[in-house]
Amino acid sequence: MRKEEIPDKSRTIPIDPNLPKWVCQNCHHSLTIVGVDSYAGKFFNDPPPSATQGSSIHGANSVLGSTRMDNSFVVLPRHKPPQSQGIPPRPRGASSPQPDATQSGKAMEESFVVVYKSEPVSDSGGSHNLSLEVGQNGPLHSNTSGFNATINVLTRAFDIARTQTQVEQPLCLECMRVLSDKLEKEVEDVTRDVEAYEACVQRLEGETQDVLSEADFLKEKKKIEEEERKLVAAIEETEKQNAEVNHQLKELEFKGNRFNELEDRYWQEFNNFQFQLIAHQEERDAILAKIEVSQAHLELLNKTNVLIDAFPIRNDGEFGTINNFRLGRLPAIKVEWDEINAAWGQACLLLHTMCNYFRPKFQCQVKIQPMGSYPRIVDSNNETYELFGPVNLFWSTRYDKAMTLYLMCLKDFADFANSKDQENNIPPDNCLNLPYKIEKDKVLGYSITQSFNKQESWTKALKYTLCNLKWALYWFVGNTNFQPLSATVSLPSNISAAGSLYAKRGPDSSKPSCKKT
């Protein structure tokens, strides 16, 4: 059989692939056992003749001895150690082999295996037979018993090493070096400790020990006995004082218990009083809180108007809203026509309510017909225009006419309110002036018509229209005592019929904000 080889810087050592794969127990790297490493090293460096290195056959006179053994040979270990020292035995009945012409001219290559076989001891001196199985470039036959013996020897060697070193075997060379260095260091430490102990023992042995004489010993004994009597007397005195202190301690504990009882009774009565006081305070605070809430509610009711609660006008981004209905459309936000119609219905109902309150003093050429989400506007010629959609965005003249008429009605009501303020001698700065100027069909320059108009401009015009309507609503609330017909509760008598709320709000409060609240 062919043998594997491990490359080395100076030589190669044959490896038997049939051997099991050993693993280093420290670094867990795989190991390959190559015969006996020490034997292989000595073999390549001119090994001396000995029993452990007996694989060289017949010295220089043999074929194996006359030829340099390099990568061409694998020497398997013997099953049993040789029984005698000296030259390895030869086969019985065979003389010293001499190199012939055919063998000496051939280089011995990677096809030779030296296998030791066990033979019974002969009468002449117990020599063993050595069988050489040689095959030029052919298959080699392994010795099964020799292989098993090799495994047993290695296993036994590892067990012995493990028992003696208390370290798991086998180990690779690097781990063996590390372990060796560690053990050497421990040995050095132990050696230093031993030397220190020996020095200490020698020092103690060299010291002189003073031995007291009989007289000195008796004198020292009397002195110690005297000290002992004094200590006993002190202990008795201390025990007496301890008894007195314990008696006083019991009296103090009795007094302390009585004091604790009195203190517990006092705190119990104090806690009961505090509990009653807290209960009365909580009842008082609850009544005061109810009074405060009732007063705030009354004040809120005094300032509340049904129109402000019924028609809240706010801003929602780019849209003006009334009762949370958006009025207008944007390219990015497609508001449904149902929501726009509902917003117009609320706006028409609010303006119609305020206009009817001042009739017949307030006469407007435009009449509003609030009909839910389908309001209509009637002009001076009794022509009716629908103020609801959907309508054609590019041709909606009737819808545009209805919005223009609504804007005209709102402007007429604002002019009427301004004239009422002037009649009541209100300063011009506090008179009703719409924040966004209305001119025909435009609010602050933005047209309220939808035909041929951008949705952004139309939405802004509607937003400003609702803001003007909110200003008119606040003026109406501040200058009237308006209540629905079904109302049974009237405002307090201390509020006058005209101008009271409007005057109390001051100049800033008369200008409502259109911001979202």
Swiss-Prot record:
Highly expressed in mature pollen grains. Expressed in roots, leaves, stems, flowers and siliques. Residues 95-105 have a biased composition (Polar residues). It holds the Pfam family APG6_N. One of its GO terms (cellular component) is phagophore assembly site. Induction: Induced by infection with the bacterial pathogen Pseudomonas syringae pv tomato strain DC3000. Induced by infection with the fungal necrotrophic pathogen Botrytis cinerea. Residues 76-106 are annotated as: Disordered. GO terms for biological process: autophagosome assembly; defense response to fungus; pollen germination; protein targeting to vacuole. Ubiquitinated. The interaction with SINAT1 or SINAT2, and the presence of TRAF1A/MUSE14 and TRAF1B/MUSE13, mediates its proteasome-dependent degradation. It comes from the Eukaryota. It is found in: Cytoplasm; Cytoplasm, Cytoskeleton. InterPro entries: Atg6/Beclin, Atg6/Beclin_C_sf, Atg6/beclin_CC, Atg6_BARA. Keywords: Coiled coil, Cytoplasm, Cytoskeleton, Ubl conjugation. Disruption phenotype: Male sterility due to pollen germination defect. Can be used to induced male sterility when expressed in anther tapetum. Development of male sterile lines is important for commercial hybrid seed production. Residues 172-266 form a coiled coil. Gene3D superfamilies: 6.10.250.3110, Autophagy protein 6/Beclin 1. Plants silencing ATG6 exhibit impaired autophagic activity and accelerated senescence. Required for normal plant development. Required for pollen germination. Required for autophagic activity. Required to limit the pathogen-associated cell death response. May be involved in vacuolar protein sorting. Binds to microtubules. May facilitate efficient recruitment of other ATG proteins to assemble scaffolds for autophagosome biogenesis. Component of a phosphatidylinositol 3-kinase (PI3K) complex composed of ATG6, SH3P2 and FREE1. Interacts with SINAT1, SINAT2, SINAT5, SINAT6, TRAF1A and TRAF1B. Interacts with TUBB8/TUB8. Component of a complex made of VPS38/USL1 and PI3K main subunits such as VPS15, ATG6/VPS30 and VPS34. Binds directly to VPS38/USL1. Belongs to the beclin family. This is Beclin-1-like protein. It comes from Arabidopsis thaliana (Mouse-ear cress). The gene is ATG6.
